[in-house]
Amino acid sequence: MSLTSDIKQELAQVHVAKNSVRAAEVSAILRFAGEMQAVGGKLVIEANLDSMQVGMRLQEFIQGLYNSRVDVHTVNPTVSRKTPRYLVRIIDNADEIARRTGLVTRSGHVVKGLAPSVVSGTISDAEAAWRGAFLANGSLSDPGRSSSLEVLCPGQESALALVGCARRIGIAAKTKDSRGFDRVNVRDAEAIGALLTRMGAQKTRMLWEEKRIKRESRTPANRLANFDDANLRRSARAAVAAAARVERAMKILGDDVPEHLAEAGQLRVQHRQASLEELGRLADPQMTKDAVAGRIRRLLTMADKRAEDLKIPDTNSVVTEDLLEEI
């Protein structure tokens, strides 16, 4: 399986609780993979995707948000195309969905960029826009001199809007016109890694980073990359252990968790292998890594004290060898 397939499989399983964030992802998928056409005097919206999982996710989100029927059809391979495609078709209430997702304005004019609600939305909305755009038409090449994370765009306006979303989450992305198509790409290795985490593909990021480090270690000038690989695994294990402890802490404390500590804890649980610095960037508003570490430390201390009082297993009880061997 390619890195691109790995990412899409992982992103298709990202849990999204807020409806506004779900709507931002839907809007981006429909913008970057969708097409509107009139059939028999009625508007039909279709999204052409390369993953059944993505198609099912889009179907679930649209039906949940807009209470409209959505069909997913498999388009069999052809002589020129050896893999199947998946067509998500929206007929029921398509006019209303087009307006609510920002594909058209209230007066019915086509929006060429991203929906205003996404462009001016929250950090989570910007992350969802990138997740949706990548699920629709994104790719990631193997690490190397020309490695890049790229999204094929329907036009210059949508490309510029995606660059703007990247800027809002601290990622440097650029537009380019290649073979008559507008594209947005990220070439810096650190930026690619950070963007994968932002979108929710932390496991694939670890795989990509491991491939990058192994490639670099093949050259004499980069022999120390092996140490980086070991450090990366140690950091990942520590992060996973912390996430498990935080989950246990939340169970111990229940509703007594202070809101600011709960927010830091949720970040740790949702992004299990991210560094403290990355968690700080994921926070809204953003925090320093020391602030994140301090809040998580206070949460664990508070839970361990409660566990001691109640004479129940503390947060360290969940950190087992089996847990760490998975990394």
Curated annotation (Swiss-Prot):
InterPro entries recorded: Homing_endonucl, Sporu_reg_WhiA_N_dom, Sporulation_regulator_WhiA, Sporulation_regulator_WhiA_C, WhiA_LAGLIDADG_dom
Superkingdom, taxonomy of origin: Bacteria
Transmembrane segments: none
Keyword terms: Cell cycle, Cell division, DNA-binding
Ranges annotated as DNA-binding: 275-308
GO BP annotations, alphabetical order: cell division; regulation of sporulation
GO MF annotation list: DNA binding
Pfam families reported in the protein's UniProt record: HTH_WhiA, LAGLIDADG_WhiA, WhiA_N
Gene3D superfamilies assigned to the protein according to its UniProt record, in alphabetical order: Homing endonucleases
The family this protein is said to belong to: Belongs to the WhiA family.
Function: Involved in cell division and chromosome segregation.
Name of the protein this chain belongs to: Probable cell division protein WhiA
Species of provenance: Corynebacterium glutamicum (strain ATCC 13032 / DSM 20300 / JCM 1318 / BCRC 11384 / CCUG 27702 / LMG 3730 / NBRC 12168 / NCIMB 10025 / NRRL B-2784 / 534)
Gene: whiA
